[in-house]
Design a protein with these regions (language model features):
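Membrane-embedded alpha-helical bundles of multi-pass transporters/translocases
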Residues: 1-178
Length: 178
């Protein structure tokens, strides 16, 4: 059903995220923390901007590839006797809506640690709360006309909201100039 296809779709998106977004975010956090502790904000911003560019450079083509070849990816990874063509097609719509948000989720995995590196967990937490509320509201609005696709789209919109607020908060911090 819808719950299962959402779960399969999200797992596939998380697989893609785990390959590069989580890896890059995990690798740069200690370096960002060290630069922030030494108040080397020029180097801090250079590293953060480079990570953002790399993330966009990877995420955008992966998103397009996934949108075009999503059916083949889902079939390759999940199709079996119990996961038939109908399951593939149900998962495909949700997967496409999830993948539209890949760039935003990937950027959030890079930008949020930049705040943590500066010992500022409040702003990414606030952005997360705002996006969580947005996710619930958009899911409630979109679930009836779009079913599971609406829930997946709501998550993408919420991820975009989170990214926007993280960038707004970065602009307000003197130490972050991205």
């Amino acid at each position: 059903g819808i719950a299962s296809s959402l779960q399969y779709s999200l797992r596939l998106q998380e697989l893609v995220l785990g390959i590069f977004a989580v890896s890059i975010g995990t690798v740069i956090l200690p370096d960002l923390s060290g630069l922030a502790a030494e108040k080397k904000y020029g180097e801090f911003n250079t590293m953060l901007l480079q990570a953002i560019k790399i993330m966009a450079l990877i995420s955008i083509p992966v998103t397009f590839y996934s949108l075009v070849n999503g059916k083949e990816l889902i079939t390759l990874i999940y199709k079996s006797k119990s996961f038939d063509e109908e399951s593939v097609m149900l998962t495909l719509g949700e997967f496409r809506y999830h993948m539209i948000g890949l760039l935003f989720i990937a950027l959030n995995r890079i930008i949020a640690p930049a705040f943590y590196a500066q010992k500022n967990p409040k702003l990414p937490t606030l952005a997360g709360i705002i996006s969580f509320i947005g996710n619930i509201l958009f899911a409630l609005i979109l679930v009836l006309p779009m079913s599971g696709n609406g829930i997946a789209l709501a998550l993408t919109i919420a991820s975009f909201i989170n990214t926007v607020f993280l960038f707004i908060f970065m602009k307000k911090m003197e130490s972050m100039e991205v």
